[in-house]
Amino acid sequence: KVLVIERGMAPGAKNMMGGRIYTHSLEKLVPDFRDRAPLERKVTKERISIGAGNEMTTIEYSYQDVKENEESYVVLRAKFDKWLAEEAEKKGALLVSNVQVTELITEGEGKKRRVVGVRCHDDEVYAKLVIIAEGANTVLLEEAGLTDPTDPKTMAVGVKEVYKFKKEDLENRLMLSGDEGLAWLTLGDMTDGLL
């Protein structure tokens, strides 16, 4: 049996990751996901913009012939995560939402120490395998002594904003055509003072 414990009210509600999904692992779990998943666009262009003061330089790489298991797609995580949770439930997983894991239950010492379950306030759940998906904020792992605290200097601040455009407007603004998708990374001094 598989139990998925979701801290948010629904899958994806607490997700802070951007909206790009790489297919190499997903394809192993759901081979026909391209036909059924809520995918927005296949990424066919990569842009990196570097800014300083009032100047910006952008590098673009375009590709069309990507091997099927090496591609990526733009997704809206709330839709995608809901779909993926439903897929897990179809395969027999039990999803519980709005439940926070407050502690990892471990046994053993030193290198033989392992996670054997989780505590959710007063409730405990034990398992042969526990997959921890707490992202960059490794609070549970740190509290259990299974990883060192994250050095703030190794972290980055990400900003995500979702806009809704008509298809034609989106393609004009981002210089795309058809079903082309774009991944765009910006960096530079425009973030000075935000930390």
What are these regions (language model features)?
Residues 15, 19-23, 41, 73, ...:
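Generic structural signal for well-ordered, non-membrane alpha-helical segments
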Residues 7-53:
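N-terminal FAD cofactor-binding segment of flavoenzymes
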Residues 56-77, 117:
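Helix-loop-beta segment of a Rossmann-like dinucleotide-binding subdomain
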Residues 7, 78, 83, 87-195:
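Predominantly flavin-linked oxidoreductase catalytic cores and closely associated redox partners
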Residues 1-4:
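N-terminal Rossmann-like FAD-binding beta1-loop-alpha1 element of flavoenzymes
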Residues 16, 70, 91-94:
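Short, flexible active-site loop motifs that bind/organize anionic cofactors or intermediates
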Residues 53-56, 123-124:
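Short acidic/polar mixed-charge low-complexity motifs
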Residues 11-13, 56-57, 139-140:
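Flexible loop/turn segments at secondary-structure boundaries
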